[in-house]
UniProtKB/Swiss-Prot annotation:
Domain of life: Bacteria
Source organism of this protein record: Bacillus subtilis (strain 168)
Protein name, entry field: SPbeta prophage-derived uncharacterized protein YopW
Amino acid sequence: MELSLDELKLCLKPLVFFGELKLEISDYEEGKKIEVLDHDEGSLINLADQTINENYVCTTCNCTLYTNENNEVCFIEHPYGAITAVNKDQVIHLTKLIGAIINTDEEDPVE
């Protein structure tokens, strides 16, 4: 399976819960590191003192894909400490990316 960055983002959409999906791609010793981020910003009410934070920004890393020199996904880091009935479908979905070739040469993936 070969995927563009846009297609990869569509595959990873189920991992985003609060904001928008962002990919951060960097080089690492054997290939590419692709961080899958859930980025959210806006206003947030602090329930403790009823103040409003107008500049709320939260970015969480939902998983990281590592490719080899051929851009083939060979390793995935994920936040699942345990696989349960609640997250098993996401884990199965994510593991299907092992062996996929990711075209990381695109300039700007669609957000």
